Design a protein with these regions (language model features):
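Flexible, small-/acidic-enriched active-site or ligand-binding loops
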Residues: 74-101
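Long, acidic (Asp/Glu-rich), low-complexity accessory segments flanking structured domains
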Residues: 100-114
């Protein structure tokens, strides 16, 4: 089956400054204790896991104290709260971590190297966003052609999954 992942990068008041991450992960033996908040977590209400940037050190430059953790969204202390948009829709969420225990084996790579991993992932994400915009333009072009050719109504029979429906309508 499918596993839904959420991205835990953005935090309240941080804007696009990922180096200002405040969500803390303190190592205690073979686990981390995570406290903090993420925001604008797209489709987090469906997430089974969240990959998070967390602060594991305050020494040195802000970028050097960030780690990358995988957190089970069903863990005790994880709360997902919807952010209702102006149109009444619910795609994004706030995610709260209150003394969440995360096995140390869920650390990705090395402690305090999360900044490097996140930069790599974001470079691919931004490239893929360009692909989405190109796809939207192509869909609009196909809609015009389908309407012109008189087959637009037939296309309404195609099943479109709920989370992606706004891209097509």
């Amino acid at each position: 089956g499918e596993v839904w992942w959420s991205q835990g990068y953005s935090e309240p008041g941080s804007g696009s400054d990922l180096a200002s991450v405040k969500t803390r992960a303190e190592r205690q033996g073979n686990k981390y204790i995570v406290n903090g908040q993420k925001t604008w977590t797209t489709l987090g209400q469906y997430g089974e896991w969240i990959f998070c940037l967390v602060r594991t050190s305050t020494e040195g430059k802000p970028q050097t104290g960030i780690s990358f953790l995988l957190i089970d969204m069903k863990s005790k202390g994880v709360t997902v709260r919807p952010i209702i948009m102006l149109d009444g829709g619910h795609e994004v969420n706030e995610v709260f971590f209150d003394n969440v225990e995360v096995p140390a084996e869920n650390l990705i790579g090395e402690e305090n190297k999360g900044w490097t991993y996140a930069k790599h992932l974001l470079s691919h994400e931004r490239t893929n966003i360009a692909d989405v915009n190109r796809s939207k333009r192509e869909l609009e072009r196909l809609k015009r052609i389908a309407k012109r050719e008189g087959v637009w109504e037939d296309l309404s029979l195609i099943h479109i999954s709920e989370p992606t429906r706004p891209l097509y309508i």
